[in-house]
């Protein structure tokens, strides 16, 4: 695959995931450093690329993939075999691999966002966080 590779987005942990994997794999790419909540994701150009208007987005030629975990898994599967980063092919081993991917997204990332939303100033963006029971 020799198509031009673009990574859209910067300044968030989610964009860092994709950027980190590109570096781990030694893959060349160009950066489009748009940020969230700046209006840059709302442009007609970016909306055509990613209708959800979120970052990051990976573009390889006509192929576009969004969601950081999907991007990381795609890159690992497509380019990671030589570096030992490709997901396992055995169904149960892959299930364990997926377990840790989903754990990091839901348990670590979601809880961090809740704490920040509850105790910092993200409530202005996302609304008040509900009280934990």
Please report, for each region that a protein language model flagged, where it lies by residue:
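GST-like domain detector, emphasizing the conserved glutathione-binding G-site
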Residues: 1-130
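Aromatic-anchored helix/helix-loop segment that forms the rim or "lid"
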Residues: 133
């Amino acid at each position: 695959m020799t198509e031009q590779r673009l990574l859209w987005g910067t300044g968030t942990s989610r964009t860092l995931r994709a950027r980190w994997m590109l570096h781990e794999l030694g893959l060349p790419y160009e950066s489009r450093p748009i940020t969230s909540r700046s209006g840059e994701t709302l442009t007609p150009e970016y909306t055509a690329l990613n209708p959800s208007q979120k970052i990051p987005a990976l573009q390889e030629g006509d192929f576009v993939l969004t969601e950081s975990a999907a991007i990381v898994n795609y890159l690992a599967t497509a380019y990671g075999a030589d570096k030992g980063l490709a997901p396992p092919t055995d169904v149960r081993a892959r299930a364990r691999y997926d377990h840790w991917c989903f754990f990091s997204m839901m348990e670590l990332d979601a809880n961090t966002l809740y704490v920040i939303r509850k105790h910092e100033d993200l409530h202005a963006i996302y609304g008040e966080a509900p009280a934990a029971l």
